[in-house]
């Protein structure tokens, strides 16, 4: 769909209901960090003696806190293993995410257009806030958000 059509669709929604703010998730909404996420999972699982599941199985856990994703993939609920997995994942993926994560087509234009319309924008994610900010800065859109909130900024990143 051409950018103009996407903006027209958004413009209709924004003018029909005067939104004051829009909250975006990052993964698969604004951007895609799949290569670094897959690398982090592969490394973390390998370090704990688990085979890496296929990429689609890992993708289905994106958006959950890492410890929960680990348990979904392995069945292991041991809190020590879950914390170790987080540390291994972060070691392998964090630096790569800034470089490898990309914005989805039209995301930058949409964020700028919403800003021109006076709509405040926030991005919320289970990613660590510093990782998320690094990605947004590297992609040149950090200034498009009034609020950046990572999973480490809250006590329960996926409340019921």
Where in this protein do the model-derived segments appear?
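Substrate-recognition "cap/lid" segment bordering the active-site pocket of phosphatases
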Residues: 100, 128-160
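Feature targets compositionally biased, intrinsically disordered low-complexity regions
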Residues: 3-5, 9-10, 39, 105, ...
């Amino acid at each position: 769909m051409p950018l103009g059509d996407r903006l027209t669709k958004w413009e209709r929604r924004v003018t029909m209901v005067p939104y004051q703010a829009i909250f975006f998730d990052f993964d698969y909404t604004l951007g895609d960090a799949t290569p670094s996420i897959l690398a982090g999972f592969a490394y973390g699982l390998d370090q704990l003696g688990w085979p890496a599941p296929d990429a689609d199985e890992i993708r289905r856990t994106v958006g959950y806190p890492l410890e929960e994703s680990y348990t979904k993939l392995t069945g292991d609920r041991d809190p020590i293993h879950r914390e170790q997995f987080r540390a291994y994942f972060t070691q392998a993926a964090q630096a790569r995410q800034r470089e490898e994560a990309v914005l989805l087509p039209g995301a930058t234009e949409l964020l700028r257009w919403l800003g021109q319309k006076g709509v405040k924008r926030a991005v919320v994610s289970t990613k660590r806030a510093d990782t998320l900010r690094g990605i947004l800065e590297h992609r040149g859109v950090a200034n498009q958000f009034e609020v950046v909130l990572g999973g480490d900024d809250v006590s329960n990143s996926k409340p019921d």
